[in-house]
């Protein structure tokens, strides 16, 4: 209902709230349905997918468990529909950046029925948690999120510059890669003079006060940034799309009450999917489960990740492996400049940090958020 189907929901492109029903559902002239089968798979416990028989849904909730059952579904679908010699592409959004590469490996590993995939399309991918999780001692997300902080500050008029957004964003990436990242690596070895210079530039790029940057030792996590950027105006900005802004219950505090961007469009999507299914004759007594806190809280993230007891989940090596053993395997990555969940620069960093053949990777950056297709010009 966002970008691929024959019908799509239209939410405000200018990052304003979607309000209440009725919402606008329109024909999608750009849908690839006339050229390809579109098979959407809801992992067990989401959508209409449920475990049956003697099985419980929770058996399939986990980083390792999830791709196995989905790969089995794909094998059976290909066989039932006699599509063994058709090109195959996998698309994953957000956590799909974990699921997608693992699924490619799982399909390739079938001892009896190995299946090669032609390509992987990643939308706002969360493929390497080292670049996304703000933990003490982990500097990767700090320099990865920084350009999106800068883009957000630019959008909300918190920086002084005559440059275009793209020019300013590129400058922020260069600063992060050449100045800020190395400064973080120095830790306490950095000189006072150098640190003051870096913090001053950090403040100028992000619109945060120098005092705030100093208080955070130039390591501002995403939620603190979301709360602080427009604090003087009484607003917090969104996480999935930082163009959105709204007031919290109290202007004080360290973090926003909620993700204002999620509040800005989720109701429209839920209404649209149920409405469209009804129109095409999908009769189900259960509701389409667009999200489930039980799934989130019980999802198994193994401490032991490929032999590294303390490692972050990282599936980018699965992409590199698929490239090495399949000369036709290609990757497309799309991301939004205003995404504070899985920022563009984090994706650029982890794709360049895991022996991926970048000549077979195409990047697209959009002036939008996590769901860049909500932004009409990006769509």
Language-model-detected regions and their locations in the chain:
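Glycine-rich nucleophile elbow surrounding the catalytic serine of serine-hydrolase chemistry
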Residues: 92-105
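A catalytic-pocket lid/entrance helix-loop region that shapes and gates access to the active site
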Residues: 104, 108-204
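Alpha/beta-hydrolase active-site loop
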Residues: 43, 60-80
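Alpha/beta-hydrolase fold nucleophile elbow
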Residues: 82-95
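N-terminal cap/lid subdomain of alpha/beta-hydrolase-fold enzymes
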Residues: 1-59
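Catalytic histidine-centered segment of alpha/beta-hydrolase-like enzymes
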Residues: 341, 368-378
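Catalytic histidine neighborhood in serine/cysteine hydrolases
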Residues: 115, 330, 355-371
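Alpha/beta-hydrolase fold catalytic core
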Residues: 187-335, 340-341
